[in-house]
Amino acid sequence: MSRSVKKPPFCAPHVLRLVNKAIAQNKLNSIINIHSRSSVILNKFIGLTFGVYNGKTYVPVKVNDNMIGRKFGEFSPTRRYTGHVGDKKVSRK
């Protein structure tokens, strides 16, 4: 089920605090490291760079206007796809 229309989009309070602090100190080019992958990207985040934790490292995510309304976790994959093993048959001549 989707979130109720009556409720505002979820964004963790500590993420909002970090963003407000970065905007107040005019540190728009610095990376803001966050663990909250479930937070929704808001309008005030446009132009900022976030380091979204994927369980091992912080993946840099530069927010643009196409990302509004989506979650941070969508841009930081947690699993690494190694691909399928190729066909190991021996070719005969």
UniProtKB/Swiss-Prot annotation:
Q: Which keywords does the record carry?
A: Ribonucleoprotein, Ribosomal protein, RNA-binding, rRNA-binding
What PROSITE patterns does the record point to? RIBOSOMAL_S19
Q: Which GO terms describe its molecular function?
A: rRNA binding; structural constituent of ribosome
Q: What GO biological process terms are annotated to this protein in UniProt?
A: ribosomal small subunit assembly; translation
Q: Which InterPro entries match?
A: Ribosomal_uS19 (IPR002222), Ribosomal_uS19_bac-type (IPR005732), Ribosomal_uS19_CS (IPR020934), Ribosomal_uS19_SF (IPR023575)
Q: Which GO terms describe its cellular component?
A: cytoplasm; small ribosomal subunit
Which Pfam families is this protein grouped with? Ribosomal_S19
Task: Kindly list the cysteine pairs connected by disulfide bridges.
Answer: none
Which Gene3D superfamilies does the record associate with it? 30s Ribosomal Protein S19, Chain A
- Explain the purpose of this protein: Protein S19 forms a complex with S13 that binds strongly to the 16S ribosomal RNA.
What family does this belong to?
A: Belongs to the universal ribosomal protein uS19 family.
UniProt protein name: Small ribosomal subunit protein uS19
Q: Which organism is it from?
A: Ehrlichia ruminantium (strain Gardel)
Which gene is the coding source of this polypeptide chain? rpsS
